[in-house]
UniProtKB/Swiss-Prot annotation:
Pathway: Porphyrin-containing compound metabolism; protoporphyrin-IX biosynthesis; 5-aminolevulinate from L-glutamyl-tRNA(Glu): step 1/2; Porphyrin-containing compound metabolism; chlorophyll biosynthesis. The active site is at C50. During catalysis, the active site Cys acts as a nucleophile attacking the alpha-carbonyl group of tRNA-bound glutamate with the formation of a thioester intermediate between enzyme and glutamate, and the concomitant release of tRNA(Glu). The thioester intermediate is finally reduced by direct hydride transfer from NADPH, to form the product GSA. GO terms for molecular function: glutamyl-tRNA reductase activity; NADP binding. Substrate binds at T49, C50, N51, R52, S109, E114, G115, Q116, Q120. This is Glutamyl-tRNA reductase. Possesses an unusual extended V-shaped dimeric structure with each monomer consisting of three distinct domains arranged along a curved 'spinal' alpha-helix. The N-terminal catalytic domain specifically recognizes the glutamate moiety of the substrate. The second domain is the NADPH-binding domain, and the third C-terminal domain is responsible for dimerization. It catalyses: (S)-4-amino-5-oxopentanoate + tRNA(Glu) + NADP(+) = L-glutamyl-tRNA(Glu) + NADPH + H(+).
Length: 430
């Protein structure tokens, strides 16, 4: 059995290819079930996001299995095999394990340390379980990766500090204005950037948010996903909203400025306004910054914040890698211990058979009335004794890192208890 991951990501494939192989969340269990039926696939799980499509597998034979999985992906998504192969990456054994942990920790994301991917990894395991694609190995692998992702976020500061322009705008507003819960925020634009702005504003405590967009319907659809009754209006009403705003964020695709000196005429003299223009081309005319009660920040101002935070996060990567190596060792100890499982199961089965036979003899001697009254207690007692006697030897067998020492112990166990010699699975070459 070999652990492998085969897939593509923002590092290996352009969006045109990624969108062609993307699998909607609701379809993942079906794809998992179909892939699981391939002859060389013992277990599988599919991680599909806007930035990656990765198939985690336990293969009976790595060479034939990888060909089988690649062919399955190409045929099921209607992509020519040579086209797909140009963008695929393959990782085996320890590299595959470490890759999933890096993904869960956000170290392989466009935005270093971003938190959404951990939830997506959790969902991947859940969807694979629905499709009956995962068993002992991948369940343990995902459990370890999720633990690693949680530890990285709780034990380091990798997830702090803005590393996107939209989050940098909100962070700068928070620094300069203080708490956002009483700030009147105006977001102009309901595209992806506008959605991110609203998301970051809500995360930082803002509650008074109005969204403007050319299409009122699109603005309404965008705010609906947040489950809040946020007001929406059209960009044509921008002038009306300027005097009742403390913070304005612009992020439309307009080719000409939306906010000019003329449209700022409604600004009150006693009003202090901060504007964050994160659009390219810019949505706010340069001369607006000349107004005494206006502070204007554009993308270039915000990039400095982004780069400072990115450099800081990069320093955190070494600390994160140390955590991942600890989790990797933990998983590899578990994986190596699988070699002992068949012998352990056989021993447990033999001991349990003896326990049941002797229990039956004892109860028959005690008489029907006593047996019926106390059978449950005696059964629990004998079961507890067996479990306690076997516990330490079983733990020590699994924990033995020296492969040859473990195999000698297994052979001794088989000889002493007259067990059949097991064809134990070989651990991967690490």
């Amino acid at each position: 059995m070999q652990i492998a991951v085969i897939g593509l990501s923002h590092r290996t494939a352009p969006v045109e290819i990624r969108e062609r192989v993307s699998i909607a969340e609701g379809q993942v269990p079906e794809y998992v079930s179909r892939l699981r039926s391939c002859s060389q696939v013992a277990e599988c799980a599919i991680l599909s996001t806007c930035n990656r499509l990765e198939i985690y597998t336990v293969l009976r034979d790595s060479e034939h299995g990888l060909r089988e999985v690649t062919r399955f992906l190409a045929e099921s998504k209607g992509v020519l095999l040579p086209t797909l192969q140009r963008h695929l990456f393959v990782l085996l054994h320890q590299d595959a394990v470490m890759h999933l942990m890096r993904v869960a920790a956000g170290l392989d994301s466009i935005v270093l340390g971003e938190g959404q991917i951990l939830a997506q990894v959790k969902m991947t395991q859940s969807l694979a379980q629905q499709g009956k694609g995962v068993d002992r190995v991948l369940n343990q692998l995902f459990k370890t990766a999720i633990t690693a992702g949680k530890r990285v976020r709780s034990d380091t500061n990798i997830g702090t500090g803005a590393v996107s322009v939209s989050s940098a705008a909100v962070e700068m507003a928070l620094r300069k204005k203080g708490p956002l819960h009483n700030q009147r925020c105006l977001v102009v634009g309901a595209g992806k950037m506008g959605e991110l702005l609203v998301r970051h504003l809500l995360a930082k405590g803002a509650r008074q948010i109005i969204v403007l967009n050319r299409s009122l319907e699109k603005a309404a659809q965008m705010v609906e996903q947040f489950g809040l009754m946020l007001p929406v209006a059209t960009v044509d009403e921008l002038t009306n909203y300027v005097p009742c705003s403390d913070l304005i964020f612009t992020c439309t695709g307009a080719t000409e400025p939306l906010l000019t000196l003329e449209k700022m005429s409604s600004l009150r003299r006693d009003q202090s306004l901060m504007i964050f223009d994160i659009a390219v081309p810019r949505n706010v005319a340069t001369e607006v910054d000349e107004l005494p009660n206006v502070q204007l920040f554009n993308v270039d101002h915000l990039k400095q914040v982004v780069e400072e935070n990115r450099a800081y996060r990069q320093l955190m990567v070494t600390q994160c890698e140390e955590i991942l190596l600890e989790q990797l060792d933990e998983f590899l100890d578990w994986w190596r211990g699988l070699e002992a499982v068949p012998t352990i199961n056989q021993l447990r089965q033999k001991v349990e058979t003896i326990r049941e036979q002797e229990l039956e003899k004892a109860l028959s001697r005690l008489g029907t009335e006593f047996a019926e009254k106390h059978q449950g207690i005696i059964d629990s007692l004998t079961r507890a004794i067996v479990n306690k006697i076997l516990h330490d030897p079983m733990v020590q067998l699994r924990a033995q890192r020296d492969i040859e020492a473990r195999r000698r112990a297994l052979q001794t166990l088989q000889t002493l208890f007259n067990l059949e010699a097991q064809s134990n699975p070989e651990p991967p070459t690490l």
